[in-house]
Amino acid sequence: MKKSKIAAGVVVALAAVWCTSAWFTGKKAEEEYLYQLEQLNQLFTKTEALEESKIFYKNIKFERGLFASHIQDQIEIHKANETIIIPLSSTLYHGPLPLDRVAKLNFVPAIFSSQTLLGKNATTQAFFDITESEKPLQLNFAMNYSLSGNAELKLASGQYHNEQSKTDFDWSNVVLNIDLNQNTPNNYVLSVDTFNSNAPNHAVSTASSIKIKDLVVQGSLQSTKWPFIYSGNINSKIGYFEQNTESAESGEKFSLIQKNSQANLTTQVEGDTVNIINKTNLDELHINGNNLGKVTNNVEFNHIDGNALQELLNILVAIGKADSECLYLKHWCKNYNKQAWPLRIISLKLSLPLFLFLMKKAKWHWI
């Protein structure tokens, strides 16, 4: 038998195995996909922040093919006076070697990979308008056989004008990447090339503009027994940050520029207490046109009463929903005194220009 015939036979056999495996994993992918939707809806039900709305992720249609399936879903947000529908369309590529991954020379076996795009309706049309893109939001997802996976959410570059506040926003290359393990977000990376906002004088009491370039935020977080408190690390880097303000009443102007800033926030849970450690480094700090040099600080809050911190976070959420904050804060201060918040400043390094600037601005009160 000629070698060419043997090779052809091997190719045909492998193709047959691939087709059979793809069909089998397509069925498994459908089962896993619908299971994940059920888990997601249960999570929505338990999320306290959504108490005023009911959110459901509903599968409308699942058309299973040999190598890929086509899916129609919708997110339903039920509020007191309205229901918002967000349509989604997905292509789910079957394992063990999903075609979209093979096209990128990625041969790592997976149950499935998928690409989800935002559909058009009266609610979502605004996303297409402000981004001028047919793919304003795109979600790429892959799940392996250990039921861990990766999700990548992309927001197309765009511009937005808020008619009520007369504020302008624009952004470019916004990407959120999340590693998933046992249905729990573990690691994430948010990157933004540019973000700008501009709020004029006549819209607010103080005009404000913000410019951000090369923002990267990396985090590894785990939930704790407190709903709003997570343990882990958050690292952020900003290549350039600028904020300019101008008071509508006095006309006083203020300018702040930070270059190459890095920050690390660590939250540790020990029994009923929480430790918060923050480290920050700035290569350059400019205030009102004055270059004040480098800034480095290391601050720790050790052995914070976890219940006190959780109640404070609850109050901040309540304040956002209420007209007055006094009663909430008085109640909290009565229950938790300053001993619940031990502050330890480990180190603070200021450049000589910044030190002189702060000394010049300081107001001394003698007793």
UniProtKB/Swiss-Prot annotation:
Keyword match Membrane: yes
GO CC annotations on file: membrane
Subcellular location: Membrane
Primary subcellular site in the record, as a coarse category: membrane
Pfam family, one: DUF945
Disulfide bridges in this chain: none
Transmembrane segments: 6-26
Cytoplasm keyword on record: no
Membrane protein topology class: Single-pass membrane protein
Similarity section: To E.coli YdgA and YihF.
Protein name per the record: Uncharacterized protein HI_1236
Protein source organism: Haemophilus influenzae (strain ATCC 51907 / DSM 11121 / KW20 / Rd)
Lineage: Bacteria, Pseudomonadati, Pseudomonadota, Gammaproteobacteria, Pasteurellales
